[in-house]
Amino acid sequence: MPHLAELVAKAKAAVEGAQDIAALDLVRVEYLGKKGHLTLQMTSLRELPAEERPAAGAVINQAKQEIQEALNARKEKLESAVLNARLAAETIDVSLPGRRMENGGLHPVTRTIERIETFFGELGFSVESGPEIEDDYHNFDALNIPAHHPARADHDTFWFDATRLLRTQTSGVQIRTMQEQQPPIRIIVPGRVYRNDYDQTHTPMFHQMEGLIVDRDISFTNLKGTLHDFLRNFFEEDLQIRFRPSYFPFTEPSAEVDVMGKNGKWLEVLGCGMVHPNVLRNVGIDPEIYSGFAFGMGMERLTMLRYGVTDLRAFFENDLRFLKQFK
């Protein structure tokens, strides 16, 4: 096989001339494939005398090994070049300053909710929640709000149909809790509520927090003491506080609570009262044995008063310049 050395030399030259993996694979097929030059050389061994075939076969195998080694070396070199090129393209300039990590912050209304939950949690109140799409029984009837009450008017409430609505207060959760639990009950209920109103101090959706205690021998004195402690803790000062007689269908007696502002004027902050006996009867609690008090407050309003915000709508506009002030 005098031309075998020449064939190997051509193969090695073709290997070195391959500029990528695809071209290199074509060289492999040309010389070592099923119909490649070296494969044909092995096939031609049958034409030799039997005694010459082993030696000739060994020479061809040696040639195949040389070509395969050349292929492997070239492939490794090409793959290394591809990797180096990719790394060069992805090079990071370690001398550049790092990107600043912007820390997020809680929304001011969320801060208010968490602050209130922490205070009442230390007094043994649990946090309850309920559906925002409510039925008229839990939102009105069970709370001593009859069908003719103005709060049920279409212009104040978002109704889906004759019995389904977006809840106007979180009081429905109080009803559900009293239906499911026996006294003593001590809960707060934060959540979104909906009313058909929109101006500088009202939005169609806002956050409310209600509280409820039902137990033996609960009095208005307990209510006043609890709310005095809460308001002074929340505003972090010894505020002047007053209770004004008011009316709510679900409490009797009822009151609204004001705090003295820095401008010397009274500011309303929440409503409260002793749970109406009819409400207790509606959930199967005997008002002759148990009594309770309830209170409710708007989270946005308390947040406005705490941080000096003048327009309620600012809480819902997602302006980072505004929100970053509360980090």
From Swiss-Prot:
It is found in: Cytoplasm. GO terms for biological process: phenylalanyl-tRNA aminoacylation. The keyword Metal-binding applies. Mg(2+) binds at E252. Gene3D superfamilies: Bira Bifunctional Protein, Domain 2 (3.30.930.10). Its EC number is 6.1.1.20. GO terms for cellular component: cytoplasm. Keywords: Aminoacyl-tRNA synthetase, ATP-binding, Cytoplasm, Ligase, Magnesium, Metal-binding, Nucleotide-binding, Protein biosynthesis. Signal peptide: none annotated. Its cofactor is Mg(2+). SUPFAM superfamilies: Class II aaRS and biotin synthetases, tRNA-binding arm. Binds 2 magnesium ions per tetramer. Belongs to the class-II aminoacyl-tRNA synthetase family. Phe-tRNA synthetase alpha subunit type 1 subfamily. PANTHER family: PHENYLALANINE--TRNA LIGASE, MITOCHONDRIAL (PTHR11538:SF41), PHENYLALANYL-TRNA SYNTHETASE (PTHR11538). Tetramer of two alpha and two beta subunits. This is Phenylalanine--tRNA ligase alpha subunit. It comes from Yersinia pestis bv. Antiqua (strain Antiqua). The lineage of its organism: Bacteria, Pseudomonadati, Pseudomonadota, Gammaproteobacteria, Enterobacterales. The gene is pheS.
